[in-house]
Amino acid sequence: EVLPSEQSCIDMGLKYVNNDACYPSLIVVGQIMEALLSGRYDLHKVAVVITQTGGGCRATNYIGFIRRALEKAGLEYIPVLSLSLSGIEKNSGFKITPKFAVKAVQAAMYGDLFMRVVYRTRPYEVNHGETDALHKKWEDKLCAELADNKFGMKRYKNNLRKIVEEFDAIPVKDIKKPRVGIVGEILVKFSPTANNDLVNLLESEGAEAVMPDLVDFFLYGFRNSTFKAEKLGFKKSSVILSTIGIK
């Protein structure tokens, strides 16, 4: 399930996060709190997992913001787990299996591919809505596949190939539009709520939006961990995980 990403999430974040925190932290905490308070979950059988970068960014402090918000809401019994290559916190009972890790990488790769084919095709489509319809078809299919217990690289590679082939088959206009790159803070860059639906705004103004891949951000993080271990005396164990991540 994708967490809600509406204006109400921002309002929820403002309620539970101090007002000198950065905008992305408001949205992240707001999304989590809105989901937990929605009534859709048994609050005695849920846990929150959040990444920690270990750097100077407020992203390292999200876990503290979330715990404080849960305490203010009377939900301090909900565990908040840290997911970090730096090993900032240890979480007993929480293990990432190889199968889970591979499926997470596949999901990220699918997302990056969708951004490339959708943003490249939609501004030029002959039949309005055809690109979004094909995207929705594949999104539903891949969500079901990622949730099942089956695992295989063959299915994954075939999906990548078919996605490209089907988007290539969409009729497009033979015109050229200005290409506008979207850069900035990672959450604001990728979240339509945070960036005021910038991609659709650019397309409505006659441009083609170009978005960097999400996976590139993680590759940067892996390379950064390797550099810190080699040049700055950080733990060598992070190099092993980073090398696996890069490969």
Residue ranges: model-predicted function:
Residues 1-247:
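An N-terminal assembly and electron-transfer interface module characteristic of large anaerobic redox
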